[in-house]
Amino acid sequence: MDSTDKKVQVASRLPVPPKRKYVSNDENQEQMQRKRLRSSLESELPAVRVAASIATSKPRAAPVAALPKPQVIGRQSLAVMRPKNSGPGITSTSFSGKTKVSSSVTQPAAIGAEKKKRAAWDLKGQVNDMRDTVSNYKGKMQNLTGENARLLNSKEKLQREVEVLASENSKLSQERCTLESQLREVRQQVSTFEREVARLTELCQRQEKELSSHTNTIEELQGANAILTKQLLDKEVKLDCVSGENTSLKHTVNEQTDEIAALKVCLAEKDTEVHSLDTERRRLHNLVQELKGNIRVFCRVRPTLTPERELPAGHISFPSNDGKAIVLSKMEESHIGREKKDAVKYDFNFDCVFPPPCSQESVFEEISLLVQSALDGYPVCIFAYGQTGSGKTYTMEGPEDVTDDSMGMIPRAIHQIFSSAEELKAKGWQYTFTASFLEIYNETIRDLLINRPDKKLEYEIRKVNSANMLLYVTNLRYVKVSCVEEVHELLKIAKANRSVAKTAINDRSSRSHSVFQLKIEGENKQRDLKTSSMISLIDLAGSERLDRSLSTGDRLKETQCINTSLSTLGMVITSLCNKDSHIPYRNSKLTYLLQNSLGGNAKVLMFVNISPLEENFAESLNSLRFASKVNECVIGTARANRK
């Protein structure tokens, strides 16, 4: 410092805020570290109080140069820059302990401690003291500047080391990630391998079990194979024997084949012969029926019922043993007194007469040949005639509780038809059957196969077409049947629906004519033959005189319609016998419906049923007279309906 004493004007020590600029966070931290360093240095300066203004003639001293701002790297470098008060010398240790720097700074004696405080007027002394202090600070500043340079170099080295370490750290991080990824893959593979090992272990165990099982099976098969091998040897021996037999059998087969061919030729000839014989049988059967008459009359006397056992019934006798005659006898009184005359006898002869003990089966045996004619293609009509209560319904249908022995003519005829049709299948015949069941009540047709008939339906008799005389009834139910049981069910339905009523003569009198018809269609494809016929089985309503029946109201109308239709039936049969040009079929619904079953192509059988009671003598006599008249008729030769 210049020795010339000059008066220096000391500036105010109040802090002046600097013009601050916007700095980044890193720069801000660096400035903060510099401020801390500066404050630590200033704390070591002695506190000197200087007057605010000094009157001196000396020039002002130059302002103290500002300390250079060292670049602070981190806390470790900052710790180096902060010297500790450890005596007169200050020892600084370089960063990370690699470089050690020692510097001894001569520190002046504490101002104001060892020296006495100068007087306020001793400005020169004060200036000298200040100069000494500045000189000391300059030396310290130089030391700090050198230390700062060394620290900067160390910082650069450390930065380079940090960069190298950061690069190595990045590489190591990447390697660590790679190794972790590989570790995860290896762990997954290990888990997969463990599962595979478990699966293979389980599979191995199963294979071992199967191997054990197969081993046992092989042993069993080997044993069986040994047995079969032995059997095979035995079979080969037998085969040699059988081969010889086979050769001889082949010769036998050839001979039998020739014989079978010859038998087939013979069978064809026999079949032709059988057909010829069957045709001849049909012809002879029809001839027998014609010889017996195409209109045949059977008389049947019903047995006495339990309530009638005490009533007189000895007026009927059967004089001959041939079963064709019946005699009615009656004692007559004189007109002038009670004197009795000789008994009057009425003799009648019919095709067959059945006394009361005759069973249903014996009666059917006489009509079975007529039923067979229906399968041969002839129209057949069988009806029962007689007064009410004479046993017509019993003869045709059977009793209420029917059994195999008490079945009437209708179920027995159906059974025979189906049985014969089954037997004829062996001869190449196939049959189809269509059944219907109706009643004619007060000249009105009713369908007995419908439980609740519609009153709006009208049943009219019409021709199928104008080319033939086939008839049908509109709205009537025609049922295809294939077995006896189906027909029996239809008979039960019809029996429940038939009109019956109580009269003075019979508690359960049939008040209508019931007509069961079965259409039979047969075909023999081998012979190219077809047949079509109709069998009609009729239970006529009971004939009775109005004076005996005491009918009134509806019963009177029923009796009148019944007697009218029966009279028309007698007229039709008489006209057929007389071969009249006009046959009054249309006079009643019954004769109009049965015209194809009563004409020249038909075979007709009439049952006349009479009561065994003497009180019914007049009605029995009238019935026998009507039957005798029918028995005298000849309606011509019946013809089968064949194509």
Swiss-Prot record:
Domain of life: Eukaryota
SUPFAM superfamilies named among the record's database cross-references: Myosin rod fragments, P-loop containing nucleoside triphosphate hydrolases
Region described as Globular: 1-116
Chain residue ranges for the region called Disordered: 1-42, 81-101
Record flagged with keyword rRNA-binding: no
One CC-aspect GO term: cytoplasm
Biased composition (Polar residues): 88-101
A biological process term (GO) from this entry: microtubule-based movement
InterPro entries cross-referenced by the UniProt entry: Kinesin-like_fam, Kinesin_motor_CS, Kinesin_motor_dom, Kinesin_motor_dom_sf, P-loop_NTPase
Binding of ATP, residues: 386-393
Gene Ontology MF terms: ATP binding; microtubule binding; microtubule motor activity
Keyword field: ATP-binding, Coiled coil, Cytoplasm, Cytoskeleton, Microtubule, Motor protein, Nucleotide-binding
Compartments, as annotated in UniProt: Cytoplasm, Cytoskeleton
Coiled coil: 117-296
Short name of any one Pfam family annotated for the protein: Kinesin
All copies of domain Kinesin motor, residue ranges: 294-633
Family under the similarity heading: Belongs to the TRAFAC class myosin-kinesin ATPase superfamily. Kinesin family. NCD subfamily.
Function recorded in the entry: Promotes mitotic spindle assembly.
Domain notes: Composed of three structural domains; a small globular N-terminal, a central alpha-helical coiled coil and a large globular C-terminal which is responsible for the motor activity (it hydrolyzes ATP and binds microtubules).
Name assigned to this protein: Carboxy-terminal kinesin 2
Organism: Xenopus laevis
Lineage: Eukaryota, Metazoa, Chordata, Craniata, Vertebrata
